[in-house]
Regions:
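Residue signature of alpha-solenoid helical repeat architecture, marking inter-repeat boundaries
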Residues: 45-53, 73, 93-96, 137, ...
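Histidine-centered metal-binding segments
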Residues: 1-39
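Short coil/turn linkers that connect adjacent helices within long alpha-helical scaffolds
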Residues: 44, 88-92, 128-135, 171-176
């Protein structure tokens, strides 16, 4: 899940480039006196579009060989923003998008070697899958995220347990391309020093 082709396989979503979404600037009768910042009222379709755009932008940053600390922070914010926009998309969103949003947040934190938040979002991803009956590649991705986050957190035993569950779930994925994506991720986890040295 570290290149554009893999993103499309996981999301099955088109890149959305909306050049016609404009925010109106609202000025009250006391211009110059700000009484707080109200979030713009976006339509569900606009939330969906922002969720997709931000999701793809996170992948672009994950694919960068060298990121600055500022870019790391931007990547974290974009992942959370994407997840939030999907939660506001109504019927255009759904449990799968929410689970994948949590999965991406976990991947971002794992890439930044931040085990605790990586585990938190991986657990949230699995919880959504279990509560909504999601299976196939989404469930396998949740186990993959838990294995990766556990390894990052320094818990080799937990990482191996989740890795085994991820392999079982991955073997049951219907689409061979989706199965290959998860298999590649699991192979990368298996050779992490904390696991390959044990």
């Amino acid at each position: 899940m570290s290149n554009n082709d893999e993103h499309e396989e996981h999301e099955h979503e088109e890149h959305v480039h909306d050049e016609h979404v404009h925010e109106e600037h609202v000025h009250d009768e006391h211009e110059g006196h700000h009484h707080g910042h109200e979030p713009p009222n976006l339509e569900p379709e606009q939330h969906r579009e922002q969720g997709v755009v931000l999701f793809n932008s996170v992948w672009e940053m994950l694919d960068m060989e060298d990121r600055t600390p500022a870019q790391d922070d931007q990547m974290v914010h974009a992942a959370h923003a994407s997840r939030w926009h999907w939660s506001q998309a109504g019927e255009l969103g759904g449990d799968q998008q929410l689970a994948v949003g949590e999965w991406q947040c976990s991947r971002v934190y794992s890439m930044l070697s931040r085990g605790e938040p990586a585990l938190h979002h991986a657990q949230a991803c699995l919880a959504i899958c279990q509560a909504s009956g999601l299976s196939d590649w989404v469930e396998a991705a949740a186990y993959e995220a838990l294995a990766r986050a556990s390894a990052v957190a320094g818990n080799a035993g937990e990482a191996r347990t989740w890795l085994a569950r991820a392999r079982t779930a991955t073997a049951a994925i219907a689409d061979p391309e989706d199965r290959e994506v998860i298999d590649n991720d699991l192979a990368a986890i298996a050779v992490l020093p904390i696991l390959s040295d044990g």
